[in-house]
Amino acid sequence: MLSIKQNKKHRGSYAIILIAVCLVGVGLYVLALAVSPSVAPLIFTKPINAKALPKAKNGENRIVIPRIGVNIPYGKGRVALDRGAEWRHPERGNPKDGGNFVIAAHRFSIQPTPMGTIEKSPFYNIDKMKLGDNIVVDYDGARYAYEITKIFEVKPNQVEIEAPSEEAKLTLYSCELG
């Protein structure tokens, strides 16, 4: 009888240890999800040479930002945002006709895997961009080049950044990190 009670005691200890190990493992996994976009440029992201990019294809609209390792498709609507970036208010501008060409993408979107989090957080490092950085946009089978001339932060209610413009410009934006 005494040995049976001791075994039950050990089973309880093993169960507690197993639960603790599982909780630590889950915590480490969640931490990996949270930090994956910040370490991606160091580990996963290959440098982008804008001059070596394949020729723009008809029907494939892309935005390439070498400084932060972004090479993603963009399009109209929320579905496009889930695939890469959203072209906001297409009627207000595009690379070919000018106006305010507005592109928005997620800054941070946690996903079930670290690679998924990286892929769904293309503008995570948007704050690392600098004046003079180049941006390449493929639109309607042609390639357009932009250079950053102004960087500023806006509040979520400052929608004037999407306003129509006589000046041909590209506006990039994303939400701030929590």
Role assignments for model-derived ranges:
Residues 13-24:
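Hydrophobic H-region at the start of alpha-helical membrane spans
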Residues 25-178:
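Solvent-exposed, non-transmembrane regions of membrane-associated and secreted proteins
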